[in-house]
Structure formats: C-alpha cells, structure tokens
A protein has these predicted regions:
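Long, contiguous interaction/targeting segments characteristic
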Residues: 98-173, 517-590, 595
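Substrate-binding/catalytic cleft of secreted carbohydrate-active enzymes
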Residues: 334-337, 344-582, 586-590, 600-617, ...
Length: 679
C-alpha cells in the first residue's frame, strides 16, 4: 500500500473516530423556532399563530399599562424529529425560563410540572418519545397568581410565556447529570482562597442509566485559555444507582484572582467523563477565584482590599419585548452600566438570565442574586402565607438559584427577601429556614435581605440592606444620611447597605424651579430626580460603614398598575428610559463620579428649553478637573468641580429669545456640550 493510501486511510480513521467521539458526547440543540401559540380558550384545530422563542403574550396589554393584562394559560406546541440513532441515549428538554407554572406534555403524555417563573428547569423525555419519527411537544404555561408560588406580589409585570431559550439535550446513558435542579452538574466549591493558594473541591453529579456498577474515569483540567494549569484524574466505581456524586479535591498555587472590574480573570474548569478510555461527556464551567469579607464598620473588601460597591438594580424587561430578551439586549444593558461606571448590581427581584450572570462574571461586576420572595411594600397585599406548599416552593426556588448559579464568581450575595412585613402570617421562622438552607447549600457566600422597616427581620441574614426613598415617598434626601447614622449607632454590629434608593423622572417633564413633586401624580420633573441622586450619593459615599448601595433603578421598567409620570404602566425611576435610548441627567452625575476613565462633560437640564425666568442656574457634571460656562459667546467664568464631579453657576442672566449655552472642559477644549434655550 503506497504512502498516499496510508495517509488517506489514516485520515478516514481519524474522522470516523472523531465522529464516534462526538456522537458519544452530549448534544444541545436550540429549539426556539416555529412554535404554535394559542390561549387556552382557543380550541379549534386552526387556532394559534406561529411564534419564535423567547416569547411573552403580554407585549401589547401589559406594556400599554392595562391593569387587567392577560394572566392565564398559554399553550406552546411544536413537532420535533427524534433521530433513530438517539435510541439508547438520554433525552431532555431544558427550559431557561417560563412564567410562572409550566406543564410539559410529550405525545399527549404529561411529563412534569415546574412551579416558578424565573429559574431554569428540565425534564427527561427518554422513555416518552418515538425514535425515527416526529414527536409532539406541548407546553402549557400559566402566569395567573398562585397562592403557593413565589412571588405573590410585585411592583412589576408578571409576564406570561416561555420567555427564555429552550434546548433539546441528548446525552450518553451515563453522563454528568443535567437534572440536579437544572444545574451544570458540577459545583466548584472554593473552600479557601488567597494570593498564595486556592483550595477547592469539585462536586460532580452523575447519572447511571445502565443501573450497573461500572469502572469510570473523571478528568478535570483547569485552564488559563488553552494552557493547562492543573489536571486531576479520578478512577472510580460508579454505583448501580441512577444518581451519585464524586468529588475531586485540588488546589492551585499562586492563583490569578478574579478581581472585580480591575481584573475579572477566570480560569476554565473542564470536566470530562470517560468509559473505558472513551470520552462520553464534557462540562465546562467558569472558575473565578476570589475571597471577600464585609465589615460592619468599614464595608466590603474584595481580595483583601476595600471596594466601595457602586451599584444599581436591574429589572429584565424593556420596551416592545417585555421580558422576552435576546443576548444583544443583555449586552446592551451591560454596556450602558459599564459606561456609567457601575461595579456592583442587584438583579432584582428574581433570578435573571444566565446570559446576564455570564456578563457580570466577564466584566467583574459584584452581584447580588435573589429569589422572588417579595413583600407588599407600600401596597395592600400579602407577600407571605403560612402554607406548607408556599414554603416548599420558596425553598425550591432558593435551591434552583444557588445550584444553577453556584459557579458564577461575580455572585457574592444570596438575597432571601424584599420588603416583608411581620403582620398577619409572620415570616420570621420561615426566613430562618431559608437562611439555614442557603448556608447548607453554599457555606461560602453570605445571605442578604432588603428591608423597608424596623424589626426582627433585619437580624436574620448575614447582611442587611434598606430600601430608602427619602425625598421621594416621604421626607427629604438629607434624611437618608440621618437614617444610616441612627441605624449604625443603634446597631453597630449590623452590616448595613442600601438596597434601593431612587426617584421618578420623565424626560418630558421639565421645570425652572427645583421643587419636590407628588410621586403618585402625573408630574415627575427630571431635575428633582437629579437633585435627589446628588444628595443621596453624598450621604452614602461619606459613610464607610455602608457596605454597598444600589440605585433603584438602572432602567425604567413596566408596572401595569402604576398611574403616574408621563404615562400609565411605567415605573420611571430609571436612570435610563425604558427603551434604552435616553440617559437622564442623573446617569451623567453617576458617570462623572464613578467612571474616571472615559472623559466627558455634560450640561444638565438641557431638555428644559422653554424658560420662564431671566436668571438661571447651570449645573455641569464632568470627570475632568473643571469647566467654563459660555453664554451667547461670552464667558461666564471657569469653575473647578467639587468632590462630587459637579460645577454650578448661579444667577446667570439670559436675554429674551434664544440663548446659546456652551460648557467646555478646562482640561480639554475638545470636550464640550451645548444647547439653545429660549425665554
């Protein structure tokens, strides 16, 4: 046989071997396209319309502020061809999110139910499909209120639908488990981390469909890009039981740490499962090594260094899409937050998409992740009922949150509740159970809660934070600092944060004077929001015992029951509009204070173009040293910014008619902002 034939034969054998290896490993196929959607009352054979996922049926009613938006049952149906060669493997359907109760049927047979609208869930369909044929998949989703499903209340829309991706998953008969509460099946437990050494344990969940004892091998590689930093091999006997766990204990010397936005470095943890030297399954997870503490007097420390957590809260909906977001939408949100200089985020009030946690990992954003255990706040309703089914559902949602997101290095806090009340059914005993469960599932992360009142609830979690709206729902902005000082003095051992603070603003509501408005009114002037945030940030930043603060909210979001601001159905406390197109003046105040890299200058109140008074005050936000104000071509003086990146000119007299206002950075005259105003 000549050399050419030998080379060809070798190539063919390599291809066959590669195909065989790949076919033995798991396959994950996105099945978002071509679903038939109909409401439960639409029962005719011709009923329904074609939709692609992610999808919500509330983009028209809820987003237009209709209080009675559709909360009921929607049916999603699709036919899927199941390949004959998949027989003998294990098949699953994985849903990344469907709100809020979902029931899966395959070929008319009920497979299972998931109760909870924000975590991923998965069902095995191996024994219920016809191989080599098309199979009917039906998902019934119900977003009606359920007394045993969190949340019972919320100042946001409860959109219905399959609003995140759906995958068909095919694995070997023996595999790394995808059904451990829809987690990856691999938990990387950071037992201790320092600059000198990181000690870890990889807890790996396994499924044995053969139900026979087998000798197997696990190989785990820790890689820096493609460079292998550490490799461990574990030979073991897989028990005859369907489910089992194996642990690999390992350490890394002189690790490179995940260090927030300064250096969000992550290793790649690759776990491979072998059967008789044949690779049959692979899972890859991020590994960001870090250590952190929170001190009641001095705040938050990441890798031994103090880090002031400058955070925002984020809801997962937007104009036209509702909660049915694509990856580009999550990326756009992250880009806007990074532009402002955010280094922390509270993903409120529920588990959000994996894509968002991936982005917070990638960009070094310290993250507060939470379950939707939400109290009524200022509304008439109940957030907790002392029903065993409700309490079990809350525990399920906490287990899902922690197991599914365990390996995200950005997540530093597990949130247990928001604005609960002790009246009526008292949640204290239950919160204690949740707190204990969180520590059992994850001994490495602290728990946190968001409170809006005094009482025993504030002493149950490792950290506590308050939702404060001084200067919006009551009082004045300076009251925030007074509250923080009084609370810290009264309970110096408490680790205190600010979980929410904010004020509404419409970009269409402008006024010459600075005056507090009525929150429930149709008048939400932008300049009051700006003033509110200037004073609130001063109060927070000057108190080192505040471990973190989170603006409510980064973006305007939909809440159909609200009748205020410039239109119904919107909570306009965002620093950016619901469609992400306009950044309010408050955004630029924070950017000037939090982002010192991207130099800019911003003239506030530019949207107030029709003036009524001759003398005006002009405010500039800039992360440069100072600015010059030029009015109708003449300098009104130069000013250095104060320690809050702000310069103010008062009593500037304007002429009748048009006035051209220009501000220029004294550092770089290429940085400028201007507007034409009329009086």
């Amino acid at each position: 046989m000549n050399t050419r034939r030998l080379n060809l034969l070798s190539t063919l054998l390599l291809v066959v071997s590669l195909i065989s290896t790949l076919s033995a490993q798991r396959q994950s196929m996105l099945i978002n396209d071509n679903w038939n959607f109909r409401f439960s009352h639409e029962v005719e054979q011709s009923s329904g319309k074609r939709v692609d996922l992610p999808h919500t049926w509330n983009t028209t009613d809820a987003l237009s502020g209709k209080i009675d938006y559709k909360r009921g049952i929607g049916n999603y149906e699709k036919r899927i061809y199941i390949k004959p060669e998949w027989e003998g493997k294990r098949l699953y359907i994985r849903f990344n999110g469907a709100n809020s109760v979902a029931n899966l049927f395959v070929n008319g047979k009920h497979i299972g139910e998931h109760r909870g609208g924000y975590a991923a869930f998965i069902f095995e369909i191996t024994d219920h499909v016809n191989y080599g044929k098309e199979n009917n998949i039906l998902v019934r989703v119900n977003n009606a209120e359920q007394l045993d499903v969190m949340p019972l209340v919320g100042d946001f829309n409860m959109y219905g639908g399959i609003y995140r991706d759906v995958h068909l998953l095919v694995t070997s008969n023996i595999c790394i488990s995808p059904i451990d509460y829809a987690s990856s099946g691999v938990s990387l437990v950071q037992q201790s981390v320092s600059e000198e050494r990181a000690s870890l344990s990889a807890e790996i969940q396994l499924l044995n469909g053969s139900l026979k004892e087998k000798r197997m091998t696990l190989k785990m590689k820790i890689q820096d890009g493609e460079r292998v930093v550490r490799e461990d091999i574990l030979d073991f006997t897989l028990s005859a039981e369907d489910k089992s766990q194996e642990n690999i204990v390992f350490s890394i010397k002189n690790p490179r740490l995940w260090n927030g936005i300064a250096d969000p470095f992550m290793y790649r943890a690759i776990v491979e499962l072998y059967d008789n030297n044949k690779l049959i399954d692979t899972i890859e997870q991020p590994l960001g090594l870090r250590y952190y503490t929170t001190d009641a007097q001095n705040g938050f420390f990441l890798n031994g260094k103090h880090l002031q957590l400058k955070g925002v809260c984020r809801h997962q909906d937007r104009a036209e899409r509702g909660n049915a977001l694509l990856l580009d939408h999550h990326k756009e949100d992250m880009d806007i937050m990074l532009d402002m200089g955010v280094n922390a985020i509270r993903l409120a009030h529920y588990p959000q998409a994996k894509e968002m946690y991936d982005l917070t990992d990638k960009h070094g954003i310290v993250t507060w992740a939470e379950i939707p255990f939400i109290g009524p706040g200022g509304y008439k309703d109940k957030g907790f009922v002392d029903l065993e089914t409700f309490k079990q559902n809350g525990k399920l949602q906490l287990i899902e949150l922690i197991k599914q997101n365990f390996n995200h290095p950005s997540i530093c806090f597990w949130g247990l509740f928001n604005e609960l009340k002790e009246e009526g059914d008292n949640p204290i005993a239950y919160v204690k159970e949740l707190n204990e469960l969180a520590h059992t599932l994850d001994p490495t992360r602290p728990t946190v809660a968001a409170s809006n009142q005094s009482g025993a609830l504030n002493f149950l979690t490792d950290l506590i934070a308050w939702n404060r709206y001084d200067g919006w729902y009551g009082g004045m902005p300076h009251n925030l600092g007074e509250f923080l000082d009084a609370t810290h003095k009264r309970n110096p051992e408490l680790k205190i944060g600010v979980s929410e603070y904010g004020a509404g603003a419409s970009i269409y509501h402008q006024q010459d004077t600075l005056a507090k408005t009525v929150p429930t009114s149709w008048w939400h002037p932008e300049n009051w929001q700006t003033h509110y945030h200037i004073e609130s940030w001063k109060a927070i930043s000057e108190r080192p015992f505040v471990w973190g603060s989170f603006v409510w909210n980064m973006f305007d979001f939909a809440a159909a029951h609200r009748t205020e601001g410039d239109r119904p159905g919107i909570n306009d406390k965002g620093l950016v509009t619901f469609d992400r197109k306009v950044k309010k003046d408050s955004f630029y105040f924070y950017k000037a204070n939090w982002n010192k890299e991207d130099k800019f200058i911003h003239l506030a109140n530019k949207r107030n173009t029709q003036l009524t008074r001759a003398k005006q005050t002009f405010t500039v936000f800039t992360n440069t040293e100072g600015a010059e104000l030029i009015v109708n071509g003449k300098s009104a003086g130069k000013k250095d910014v104060d320690k809050f990146a702000t310069a103010v000119w008062k009593d500037i007299e304007l002429q009748k008619g048009e006035n051209v206002i220009k501000v220029v950075s004294t550092d770089d005259n290429r940085l400028m902002d201007k507007v034409a105003l009329y009086r």
